[in-house]
Amino acid sequence: MATPRGQTVWFGNEFPNDDLKDLFRRLHQHSKDRRFRLLSVFLDESTAILKEEVANLPQQLQELVPHFDTACTLPEVDFRQGPLGAAMESALLTILELGMLIGNYEAEDIEWDLDPSQTILAGLSIGIIAGAAVALSSSLADVAKVGAESVRVSFRLGVYVADISTKLEAPQSDGTLQSWAHVVTGMSHEAVQEELSQFNAVTQNPEITKVFVSAADKTSVSVTGPPSRIKAAFQHSPSLRYSKSLPLPVYDGLCHAPHLYSQDDIEIVINSAKSVIPTSRPVRLPLISSQTGKPFEAKTAGELFLEIGTELLTGTIYLDNVTAGILEHVKLKEPTGNYQIISFRMSQVLNGIQAAIETDFPALGRARRDLVSWVHGDYGARRPSSYAASKLAIVGMACRLPGGANDPELFWELLEQGRDTLTTVPPDRFDLNTHYDPTGKTENATQTPFGNFIDRPGYFDAGFFNMSPREAEQTDPMHRLALVTAYEAMEMAGLVPGRTPSTRPNRIGTFYGQASDDWRELNASQNISTYAVPGGERAFANGRINYFFKFSGPSYNIDTACSSGLAAVQAACSALWAGEADTVIAGGLNIITDPDNYAGLGNGHFLSKTGQCKVWDKDADGYCRADGIGSVVIKRLEDAEADNDNILAVVLGARTNHSAEAVSITHPHAGAQKANYRQVLHQAGVNPLDVSYVELHGTGTQAGDAVESESVSDVFAPSMPRRRPDQRLYLGAVKSNIGHGEAAAGIASLLKALLVYQKNMIPKHIGIKTEINPIIPKDLDRRHVGLAMSNTPWPRPAGKKRLAVVNSFGAHGGNTTVLLEDAPERVKVSTQDDRTTHPVVISAKSKKSLQANIEKLLSWLDQNPDADLADLSYTLCARRMHHSMRFGAAASDIAALQKTLRSWLDSPKASTELRAIPNDAPSVVLTFTGQGAYYSGMGRELFAEFSYFRTQVLQLDQIAQRLGFPSVVPVIDGSIDDGPASPILTQLSVVVLEIALARFWSHLGIRISAVVGHSLGEYAAFAVAGVISAADALYLVGRRAQLTEERCTQGSHSMLSVRASEDDIEELIAGSPDTAEIAYEVCCRNTPQDTVIGGTKESIDRIRQALEANSIKCTQLDVPFAFHTAQMDPILDSLETLATPIAFKAPSIPVLSPLLGSVVFDRKSIHAQYLRRATREAVDFVAAIEAAQDFGLVDAKTIWIDVGPHPICAGLVRGIDSSASVISSCRRNEDNLATMSKSLVTLHLAGLTPCWAEYFRPREREYSLLKLPTYSWNETDYWIPYIGTWTLDKALLKYGEKKAPLSLAMSRPSALRTSLVHQITAETVEATTATLHVLSDMQHPDFLEALHGHRMNNCGVATSSIWSDMAFTVGEYLYRRLVPQVKDVHMNLSDFEVLHAQVALEKKGSVQPLVLKAHLDLSTSSMSLTWFNASAETGECAAESFATGVVRFEDPAAWTREWDRLSHLVLGRIEALEQRAAEGKASKLSKPLAYALFKNVVDYADRYRGMDQVVLHEHEAVAEVTLVAERHGTWHTPPHWIDSVSHLAGLVMNGSDASNTRDYFYVTPGCSSFRLLNPLKAGGKYRSYVRMFPLLEEANMYAGDVYILQGEQIVGMVGQIRFRRVPRLLMDRFFSPAAASHAEKQLQETAPSATSVKKSTPPAAEAPASVPALLSNPVAIPFPAASKSEVSTPPLTPPSQQESPGESAVITPATSDRGDPVDAGVVGQCLQVMARETGLEVDALTPDASFVQLGIDSLMSLVLSEKFRAELGIEIKSSLFLECPTIGEMTAWLEEYC
């Protein structure tokens, strides 16, 4: 159709028939897109005008208007109701029509086409006001501005009309709307007027309330007046009563009433408020009056609005006149042209006008343009007009949730399987046996035992997060797991800080919800330490994340009770919408440990006493508490798409409000919840019926379920309009599965919703255990809404997006709601990937983690054999944070990668030789090759793949061409054949390639430390170093090549590479008569054994023959000229002349000069004459490299990058230094990208992390971010158990009661009780693991008797046989708990270690508790054991264990096979000993004599004296043993029996004449294993044999195996029992009651810990007596590797610290991993203090370890400074830890100044 020659724009007085709410929602949505900037401006201006007008209303009217952020949300309420109905309707109609017009132009991208000569505007009633805005505009931007004034006038007119009209007739009391106008058809205007006049006269109707005609045309008449008067008029007049009439939707008053309004009224409406536009603004387009049918005569805006106001208030509408006016406009145009009507849908009036046009102008072409239909169009991804207009993308998530849901996939498995994670409170939280009272009579006790708990809450990788063990232990576990899940969520998101603009660290913020402080208030408060505040205060939860990752965006910790987690997400979203951050990490945190909170919530009737949250169940009786940690990563959607992220779901809106009107602060309120839903829906412009899934808050309380079911159903599934059957709304409640995570509840709900999107399934609801709660609305099914009672598919409709809502409500009254939709459908770009080789890098912060990461990846590859190697490379390189322990490879396919990974894992050297990258990145030197490496296509793949490299080449090529030289691009991209080329092309292409390569390396993030060029390569090196410009370099190279071609003869001279030194060549040539006179020149000294010589071709050929005759390898160089020889003389003057005008500058990068044999830093060394000399003189590459070494610019770690077509210089560097690290940029006959991949991996492994983002940028849209396994944490358990019952005891204080001292006799009965094991305090049994904590009192009569059966220095000292019996007792108990059907349990007590022996207290009636902790894992068939002293007051464990061991559950058949192979050897030695005794060569000792010798060190009680006779020779002995018949207590294996069969080794060491027993005594620090084939029998007869020998690797230490025999069979063995030689003068110190506590205190302050995990300890003065592990019992505990101390000399305590000889402490020097003692001077003492205070081993304090890596922060620096002063008398400032950032620098300072 031809272009219209005329057009009418029609502004009607009625809304289109479309869903009005939907129209405004869509307007709102489009306004957020920057493609609709003017629409957004118009709506913002209109909203502002309306807010201003509402604010000017009387208070009672203001209160009728709901809050609105945009006028587009006002239609969501019934705006026609109330006194402001007319005003709202008028304003909204104006907004809709103008908004639709503006949006139409922007959507279709139409130029402003309303030409005044071709266009006329027309409309009715309020529509004319909208038309006025267009009439006053000359552009679309004008409409957006002027339109706001039209909105103002419309609103004011409506307010005024309603105000006047209500004075004429009051509204209906029930709110029913009544029409003020009826339309009559079939009667003429005159007939209707006559009937009305008669009615008004007869009824004496006052003038102001009369019924009158407001509009008329040929077929209809509008009758207007007060509703009751209209009704009366129709009843009065039979003609009217029986006419065809209909009420019009005019509900708010009278217009078109000249008898009612005057000019003053019009002035009040139009001019009483300041116009938003100048009143003088000219009228641009004709606007037809609905009264006259002619254009308004007004010339300005002020006049126009007055005329319109006059017409609307006092004028009658004559539609015939309007039609005539439009027909007149049509008539003036081409009668046979085209005419267009532009309107907002069609109406009856418009149909009539169009019919009139068709009748009068039948030949006229007609067109229609609808201004509404565009709003339903899809214009692709939104381009937000502002931050606030953005949708948000959730791109990563991680969790630790109950039931082992330690990652999202495990969480989904739990949901999909419908599992319930309910359990009772684990013993590691608190003891239910003491803290649970269902009757509620015990104060501070919980009335419910139930909860939902995460696995291993204390486990944490402290080293990864640069925290010392001491700091980690004091840090709240939820803070630790916030760090961990934040990292894992970032891993899933592929978030590498700084990779993209949206991930800059200063634009990343953290928001976490937390509502309790259990750890700070309970666990950590048992021993408040340095890290109490940063470890426990809430703000540090997310502050620590910001600090560790160096995020400087906002950091908020939010407490809104149960909704804290989702409120934190909402706050994070608000920060994104406000532009305060570009990426946020948000979540919720809850770890339960404190029974006080259980008691408080129970007493507040929040908690269920019967178990899990029973959401919507009729028996719902409260919620069940739960742990939970969750983190999500959120960005703006456009940023996520730009960053190539995987989008889990999109956030459309999020809001929080408060239930202010609830009946109590903790009671929910349906009205507040509904208001919040509507705010979120309004924010997003979403129809609530389009939401198909709601994740309920759903706590399972009667009040909560009732209120939420009401609010959700009323908003999302109202009775009217009702959902269609295909619009079913599904509901879910995750608390039915995992309980109520309180501060983490909201984030758990969000994670579930995200998984529902990912899995396209709604998991079944398991909360209804009996039947649905009758308080739930009964008609839900009719409304098509309900819980998903089975796993329900939730497919994504084609081309559409699913909407979901997540609720979370706080007990304090807060309501948070988040609205989600599907991620945009992503179509992966599919093109041919030219990269045949891909880099793959994996990293970790520890060797263990790296190995596990590789194993995880291998497993993932096995499960995903179709994985794309390119995607894997992209994910691991560009989308991962990289750490210090690294693996890397370049692979061509998945199979090759798998082979490489397995090979690395299988290699014994892989782990032992693995080293962390250095803290300081190695230096990088670029070596620029000469022209000898030229070939066509030498940069082909790089040129094709990388736009940056290509741009550099093209720019340099353009310079070269402008200098008059040929293009080098064909050489680089390989578009010319490889073959001979001119020197100009050859040399220019090499230099262009090298400059481009150097810049490309910098582009990839490689920082260059120095450059060196070889021959021609020097020009490229100078350009890269900034000595000369790139243009100058190309000019000089090109002109030099031209001069060479012009003045030198090709082929007359040649160059020869000789594998020999310059001196060797000279000697060989001069020494032969045939060659002595031949002239040649040295061109290059490449390496000490690689020299290039040059000369005439004839001379060089003869020399080559002579050298090869002497077996010297020679290679003829393929060059046309002999550079650096006399052949270059003809060009030297001209070259110098050409270079003289060039500006030579000081290098920005040091230049290694082969000419000068030095490093150039200044601007004077390189000049025109330098280039002359460099052309003529030899290239001394060796001298350049050696100069760099002398200057310290390069070292053994330096990386040398060969920048050239082929790695020639790399080979030269290796020839000079065989250990040098060299890599290539390009390599002949190898794909550039394969070469680059290998080189980048090498750089990465060396500690130079490339900018992987740039490497992958060219094809990023083709790659997908893979969901790979998460990081493998190197975890340690940092759990501080709550000891005792003090949360209960404090309740007694108000009664004046005090807690009695710890007494095991008062404790409840225990399931396991023996003479040594007295009370189980904690027990957890799962499928394959079990944990047990037992409490024992060494003052218990049986225990005390066992101690006094082994006396040293008149003290009862615990023998290792005591610990052996405890180990076997606990081991068999736990094993049978897991494997109840087992018949016999065979145990090997192995790796037994001890730090401090236990000495019995002498004070009668005292308590001396100890704690044994055991953890059995069936997967390893082992059980770990740790013994602790405990406080006599509280039962709290000491800071460090005094003994550890491992019980291994083994096959006795294997023992028998082992011992059978050895028995003949043992029996042979026994026979030899007995023969020696018979010969008088060995001592034969009776029982009294043997134990008399033993008494030299230890005095055994009678029951321990089982050896009947002993044959002893030097350090070898055999004993006949008879066990006493009595067990003397309840044991697994009585300690006195164990000692009897094994303490022969102690007699050998302390009774043999081969030992120096006068000056020393010998004690055992332990053994490697202890096994008994069968239980020892009362009265049983055995033989023991042992041979002790000195350990060469450890001075003063002896070891041996004790064999236990019955008859000829070995039935037991103590493997590698060790004895240490100790000066006898220390006997009193270690084994006396008075000194025991003092020695313990001293050793706790100086000795290294047996474990890096230090537990809280009571004050030292209250510690139980214990001494170092210097025991004589045969089965004791060896020192750990870090504590192989030899106490053979008096203490090395500084005199200033010695109080008296009798009180001097023994300082046990720690040893390094090589077994060498750590320096016992100041440095050693300082290291000991540092190890003790941080909880680290001394071995960890290596010289290269940094304080940051060790977790020594500013707070710990202050502590250490104070400890150095107080204990060592050393005054240092805490700032020293900043000035000396590593251990090595610190120790160097101490050695220098202390």
UniProtKB/Swiss-Prot annotation:
- Residue numbers bearing the O-(pantetheine 4'-phosphoryl)serine modification: S1754
Annotated stretches, region: C-terminal hotdog fold: 1482-1628
Q: Where is this region: N-terminal acylcarrier protein transacylase domain (SAT)?
A: 19-256
- UniProt GO molecular function: 3-oxoacyl-[acyl-carrier-protein] synthase activity; fatty acid synthase activity; phosphopantetheine binding
Entries under Pfam families matching the protein: Acyl_transf_1 (PF00698), CurL-like_PKS_C (PF22621), ketoacyl-synt (PF00109), Ketoacyl-synt_C (PF02801), PP-binding (PF00550), SAT (PF16073)
Question: Which GO biological-process labels does this protein carry?
Answer: fatty acid biosynthetic process; secondary metabolite biosynthetic process
Q: Where is the composition biased (Polar residues)?
A: 1644-1655, 1685-1701
Its cofactor is:
pantetheine 4'-phosphate
Task: Identify the InterPro entries for this entry.
Answer: Ac_transferase_dom_sf, ACP-like_sf, Acyl_transferase_dom, Acyl_Trfase/lysoPLipase, Ketoacyl_synth_AS, Ketoacyl_synth_C, Ketoacyl_synth_N, Malonyl_transacylase_ACP-bd
Q: Which residues form the Ketosynthase family 3 (KS3) domain?
A: 389-822
Q: Does the keyword section mention Acyltransferase?
A: yes
Q: What keywords does the record list, in alphabetical order?
A: Acyltransferase, Multifunctional enzyme, Phosphopantetheine, Phosphoprotein, Transferase
Which pathway does the database say it acts in? Secondary metabolite biosynthesis
EC number(s) for this protein?
2.3.1.-
Q: Where are the catalytic residues?
A: C562 (for beta-ketoacyl synthase activity), H697 (for beta-ketoacyl synthase activity), H740 (for beta-ketoacyl synthase activity), H1350 (proton acceptor), D1539 (proton donor)
Q: Region Disordered: which residues?
A: 427-448, 1637-1665, 1682-1718
Q: Where is the Carrier domain?
A: 1717-1794
- Which intervals of the chain are annotated as region Malonyl-CoA:ACP transacylase (MAT) domain? 928-1249
Q: What class of enzyme is it?
A: transferase
- Protein origin, superkingdom: Eukaryota
- Where composition is biased (Basic and acidic residues), the residues are 428-440
Record comment regarding domains: Multidomain protein; including a starter unit:ACP transacylase (SAT) that selects the starter unit; a ketosynthase (KS) that catalyzes repeated decarboxylative condensation to elongate the polyketide backbone; a malonyl-CoA:ACP transacylase (MAT) that selects and transfers the extender unit malonyl-CoA; a product template (PT) domain that controls the immediate cyclization regioselectivity of the reactive polyketide backbone; and an acyl-carrier protein (ACP) that serves as the tether of the growing and completed polyketide via its phosphopantetheinyl arm.
Name the record gives this protein: Non-reducing polyketide synthase nscA
